[in-house]
């Protein structure tokens, strides 16, 4: 399409786009909830909370857990629990617990989606500048990229703590475009959620929406990205590079 004709660089979301991080995130969320004697949520539910950064993830987890506990107690004929700790303080405690547990399980609970490693390698070898924009807390990002052996492909990495405003605000995309030395319209942004597409539109970047990510249970088509792909390596022909159906699926 016309918007992809003058692309000089590509920036990517992380969770749900390059990596399946749900197992690790869900494990850390559940361990944090369990430590506070709250109901655990499970991976299927946690997936619907991913995408707005760790603080929002904690808020969603705590809201659900308190409501779930109240429902369970009512079902058993027990009175509601008096909350000794305000919700804001409980979120802060939950976040500290989450950070500790996620640091323990992040690497083993995260794998690359199919074709990601080889596609990134092909894009990098073609001379395109590559960047990463994630709402994930910054301290977790670099070690994770290194463990998956994809850090070498990115010239710029922007984590959730590196900007004042996370996606869907355009700030992180505008920052990575600036650091890559290009105009926003020259940088393609690839993501799996409405936050990604909204950020791209607000920044003036063309966008690709991937169908296999998390996106709160919604179809990515509802966010109206410029292009929709089912497989990560569909990016290659779109950018004038050979498409390989035999790329290595690297998830070790």
Curated annotation (Swiss-Prot):
CDD domains xref list: HAD_PGPase
BP term (GO), one: carbohydrate metabolic process
Pfam families in alphabetical order: HAD_2
An MF annotation (GO) of this entry: metal ion binding
A GO CC term attached to the entry: cytosol
EC numbers on record: 3.1.3.18
Domain of life: Bacteria
Keyword line: Carbohydrate metabolism, Chloride, Hydrolase, Magnesium, Metal-binding
Family, per entry: Belongs to the HAD-like hydrolase superfamily. CbbY/CbbZ/Gph/YieH family.
Chain's role: Specifically catalyzes the dephosphorylation of 2-phosphoglycolate. Is involved in the dissimilation of the intracellular 2-phosphoglycolate formed during the DNA repair of 3'-phosphoglycolate ends, a major class of DNA lesions induced by oxidative stress.
UniProt-listed PANTHER family: PHOSPHOGLYCOLATE PHOSPHATASE (PTHR43434:SF1)
Complex formation: Monomer.
Name by which UniProt lists this protein: Phosphoglycolate phosphatase
Organism, as annotated: Salmonella typhimurium (strain LT2 / SGSC1412 / ATCC 700720)
């Amino acid at each position: 399409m016309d918007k992809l004709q003058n692309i000089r660089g590509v920036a990517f979301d992380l969770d749900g786009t390059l990596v399946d991080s749900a197992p690790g995130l869900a494990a850390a969320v559940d361990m944090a909830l369990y430590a506070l004697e709250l109901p655990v949520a499970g991976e299927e539910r946690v997936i619907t909370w991913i995408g707005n950064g760790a603080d929002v993830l904690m808020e969603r987890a705590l809201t659900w857990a308190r409501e779930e506990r109240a429902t369970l107690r009512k079902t058993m004929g027990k009175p509601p629990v008096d909350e000794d700790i305000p919700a804001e303080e409980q979120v802060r405690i939950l976040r500290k617990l989450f950070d500790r547990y996620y640091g323990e399980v992040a690497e083993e609970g995260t794998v690359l989606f199919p074709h990601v490693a080889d596609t990134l390698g092909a894009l990098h070898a073609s001379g395109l500048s590559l960047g990463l924009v994630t709402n994930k807390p910054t301290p977790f990002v670099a070690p994770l990229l290194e463990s998956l052996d994809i850090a070498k492909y990115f010239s710029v990495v922007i984590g959730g703590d590196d900007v004042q405003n996370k996606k869907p605000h355009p700030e992180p995309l505008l920052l990575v475009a600036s650091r890559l030395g290009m105009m926003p319209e020259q940088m393609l942004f690839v993501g799996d959620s409405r936050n990604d597409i909204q950020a791209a539109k607000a920044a003036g970047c063309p966008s690709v929406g991937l169908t296999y990510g998390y996106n709160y249970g919604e179809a990515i088509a509802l966010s109206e990205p410029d292009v929709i792909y089912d497989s990560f390596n569909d990016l290659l022909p779109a950018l004038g590079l050979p498409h390989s159906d035999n790329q290595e699926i690297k998830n070790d």
